[in-house]
């Protein structure tokens, strides 16, 4: 459902900025800081300089530049979210360029990624339900600013969404058909794809998505494991909200849905598109990500039980 990961300048120079340059850039935006306390490159496309354990300079790494990722897009999304204090995200303090390097200055998200700690049982369900409430608020924002921005790729009409779902399902069916040992379900890939497409309603809500609000970008407090918030909106795009269900098990996804529906239930039309999007996501993962295939098949089995 996303643009491909084609790096447009893979041979570009990728300098690590010295501390003096980092401090100078951040101070241009009215931030008082004294030292770079950590440099983080785990995000791949960006390099993050942490200052005084409170602020972040996030720079686009030139060799990792790709069409779907944009710091301008992240700054835009975070600015829109600043009107909603219940949705906890970093606060943008500045966005610009230094020489040929694009950057954002922002506050550091407190806590740690779920991926780095063990969150299980009741605590995991609580985190997922709070994340679901957060995503419902995020998806419920006015969409005109996102639809009107060229920064956000994706599907802006039902016809575009259905065409993309059909094309991606067809590709997944083709790949799985060429390697039949991948498929261990009673229903054939083609029949499952047909059932999913037939269930899509005439009305589909399409909104700006985070893109990957999974364990790597969902933050919790390390001592209590309480939910804190979300980071990294640079891959955002427009499509169906279900494509923001980026968690490893179907039980995780159901808990997230419970939180999503806490204040206002979703419609039958939403649920039909939700199932379709999850089947698409899982069939695509089965076709392209061998390391997750056992888990993906388990999710698909659970999903099949919810399909009429």
PLM regions and their residue ranges:
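An alpha-helical support segment within catalytic cores of ATP-dependent transferases
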Residues: 14-34, 110, 124-129, 137-210, ...
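Short glycine/proline-enriched coil/turn segments at helix->beta-strand junctions
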Residues: 31-32, 51-55, 86, 249-254, ...
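Conserved catalytic motifs of the protein kinase core domain
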Residues: 52, 101, 204-206, 226
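Hydrophobic alpha-helical segments that form the core
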Residues: 273-284
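Phosphate/pyrophosphate-binding loops and the adjoining catalytic core of nucleotide-dependent enzymes
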Residues: 1-20, 25, 78
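ATP-binding pocket architecture of kinase catalytic cores
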Residues: 35-156
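Active-site Asp-x-Gly
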Residues: 206-209, 214-272
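ATP/Mg2+ or Mg2+-diphosphate-binding catalytic cores
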Residues: 2-13, 170-171, 175-177, 258, ...
């Amino acid at each position: 459902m996303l643009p491909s990961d084609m790096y447009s300048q893979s041979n570009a120079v990728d300098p690590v900025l010295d501390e003096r340059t980092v401090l100078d850039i951040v101070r241009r935006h009215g931030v008082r800081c004294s030292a770079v306390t950590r440099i983080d490159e785990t995000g791949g496309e960006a390099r993050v300089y942490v200052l005084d354990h409170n602020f972040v300079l996030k720079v686009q790494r030139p060799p990792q530049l790709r069409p779907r990722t944009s710091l301008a897009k992240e700054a835009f999304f975070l600015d829109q979210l600043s009107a909603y204090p219940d949705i906890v995200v970093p606060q943008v303090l500045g966005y610009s360029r230094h020489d040929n390097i694009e950057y954002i200055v922002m506050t550091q998200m407190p806590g740690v990624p779920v991926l780095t700690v063990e969150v299980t049982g009741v605590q995991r369900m609580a985190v997922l339900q709070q994340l679901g409430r957060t995503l419902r608020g995020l998806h419920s924002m006015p969409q005109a600013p996102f639809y009107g921005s060229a920064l956000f790729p994706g599907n802006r009409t039902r016809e575009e969404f259905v065409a993309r779902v059909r094309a991606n399902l067809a590709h997944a069916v083709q790949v799985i058909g060429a390697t039949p040992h991948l498929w261990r379900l009673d229903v054939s890939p083609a029949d499952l794809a047909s059932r999913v497409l037939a269930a899509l309603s005439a009305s589909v809500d399409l909104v700006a998505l985070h893109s990957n609000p999974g364990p790597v970008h969902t933050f919790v407090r390390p001592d209590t494991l309480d939910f804190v918030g979300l980071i990294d909106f640079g891959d955002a795009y427009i499509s169906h909200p279900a494509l923001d269900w980026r968690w490893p098990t179907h039980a995780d996804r159901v808990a997230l849905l419970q939180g999503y529906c806490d204040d206002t239930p979703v419609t039958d039309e939403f649920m039909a598109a939700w199932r379709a999007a999850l089947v698409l996501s899982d069939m695509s993962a089965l076709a392209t990500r061998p390391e997750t295939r056992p888990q993906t098949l388990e999710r698909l089995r659970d999903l099949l039980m919810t399909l009429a």
